[in-house]
């Protein structure tokens, strides 16, 4: 049976792959429309669910330093991940429309940005490398700025475009690097069952 670290490492890589799929299909959807929206929504469901083991393993690492704070940060992130996954799944299943979920998905994505930012801050005294923390902070800021830009001016607003670009690059770095460290066992994850 794989350890939490191995599961989280694989999940981080899956999240990185879905980030690429999501960005490409989002661009295709906004430029061409059609089925690309459904593909983007489906990739978002997988991405959000893949991030849950990542949030859990980071909480385990953070618990060595900041107990209650680590649990609160993980709860914020997992709640946002589940909310966005459910909303996007309902969209894929055509139970709701894009207009019905847009505000809630943007809000959930902004909360996801808060999770990335808080994770970067809370991981300061842990074994998580500074580069991953910086990427997490950049991703968090990117998601928050993108949500703001989208809310005030739509997908073509400069803040939305800049925020998505920063979030895209930063989350790729965060997910791919963290996944590699977890899978190669180059990041210490406490094992309380030893």
Regions found by a protein language model. Give the residues of each.
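Hydrophobic, aromatic-enriched alpha-helical segments typical of multi-pass transmembrane helices
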Residues: 1-194
């Amino acid at each position: 049976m794989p350890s939490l670290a191995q599961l989280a490492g694989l999940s981080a890589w899956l999240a990185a792959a879905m980030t690429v799929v999501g960005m490409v299909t989002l661009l295709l959807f906004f430029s061409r429309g059609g089925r690309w929206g459904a593909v983007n929504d489906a990739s978002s469901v997988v991405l959000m669910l893949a991030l849950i083991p990542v949030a859990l393993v980071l909480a385990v690492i953070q618990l060595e330093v900041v107990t209650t704070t680590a649990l609160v940060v993980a709860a914020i992130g997992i709640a946002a991940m589940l909310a966005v996954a459910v909303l996007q799944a309902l969209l894929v299943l055509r139970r709701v429309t894009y207009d019905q979920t847009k505000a809630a998905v943007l809000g959930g994505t902004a909360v996801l940005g808060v999770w990335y930012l808080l994770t970067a801050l809370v991981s300061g005294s842990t074994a998580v490398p500074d580069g991953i923390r910086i990427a997490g902070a950049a991703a968090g800021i990117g998601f928050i700025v993108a949500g703001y830009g989208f809310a005030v001016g739509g997908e073509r607003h400069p803040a939305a475009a800049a925020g998505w670009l920063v979030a895209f690059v930063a989350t790729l770095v965060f997910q791919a690097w963290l996944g590699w460290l977890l899978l190669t066992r180059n990041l210490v994850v406490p094992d309380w069952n030893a």
